């Protein structure tokens, strides 16, 4: 059985004999998440934060509302979609102990290719303590960048081509091992939120990636840094058009050169 989906990215829900899944048809003419997120070569690639939006929409499609927690979101292979082509992507939520297992697969002539996996569970906790923005700004007084007529440039733009929706950085203040930034969607794209996007992939992408300069030895000329996994992420609600992002560098993991948390 097939039924239409209600969220922005998904086209339909498919109910098979043994398994049900949600489908999205990815191509650059339909999804700005692809068209505005490209390698320097021009090749469109689905952003890591796009998987988080897919997960949030999948929960909504299944009637699972309220705060939730993502654990061990792991990226297994990139999802490239050449211009003029399309990829059918399946998102499966399977009940398991304490929550659901998430799998993201693309359809190919030889079968399914797995791109990402995660665990997700609903939260029944109180509202989180609000970030003390003034205190964070006071600590991070080493260097401040403020946007003028145009948004600030993201460090990753040396290796990626970002579209207009990714131009969201309004200010960054760096401290020792931490940074805080103000980000806002351009007025032309606030309507994305009205369409039902919960965790806007462009806004979230820059919110989690603007502070690469905190990493010891980071040099964008060395190549593109990409997310490998999100260990834990708690989502208490949809992102508004304007947000603050506080990033702290965790050096306790001892991952070695080329890795950071």
Where are these regions (language model features)?
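Acyl-thioester-processing domains in fatty-acid/polyketide/NRPS systems
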Residues: 1-261
């Amino acid at each position: 059985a097939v039924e239409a989906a209600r969220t922005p990215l998904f086209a339909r829900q498919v109910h098979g004999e043994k398994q049900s899944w949600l489908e999205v048809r990815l191509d650059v003419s339909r999804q700005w998440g692809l068209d505005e997120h490209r390698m320097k070569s021009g090749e469109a690639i689905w952003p890591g934060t796009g998987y988080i939006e897919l997960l949030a929409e999948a929960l909504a499609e299944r009637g699972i509302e309220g705060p939730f927690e993502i654990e061990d979101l792991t990226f297994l292979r990139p999802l490239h979609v050449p211009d003029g082509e399309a990829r059918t992507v399946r998102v499966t939520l399977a009940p398991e102990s304490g929550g659901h297992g998430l799998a993201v697969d693309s359809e190919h002539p030889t079968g399914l290719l797995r791109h990402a996996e995660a665990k997700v569970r609903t939260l029944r906790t109180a509202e989180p303590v609000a970030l003390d923005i003034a205190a964070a700004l006071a600590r991070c007084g080493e260097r401040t960048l403020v946007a003028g007529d145009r948004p600030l440039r993201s460090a990753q733009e040396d290796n990626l081509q970002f579209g207009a929706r990714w131009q969201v950085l309004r200010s960054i203040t760096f401290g020792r091992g931490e940074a805080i930034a103000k980000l806002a969607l351009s007025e032309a794209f606030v309507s994305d939120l009205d369409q039902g996007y919960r965790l806007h992939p462009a806004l979230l992408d820059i919110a989690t990636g603007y502070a690469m300069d905190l990493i010891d030895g980071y040099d964008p000329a060395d190549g593109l840094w990409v997310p490998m996994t999100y260990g834990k992420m708690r989502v208490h609600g949809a992102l508004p058009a304007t947000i603050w992002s506080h990033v702290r560098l965790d050096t306790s993991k001892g991952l070695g050169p080329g890795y950071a948390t």
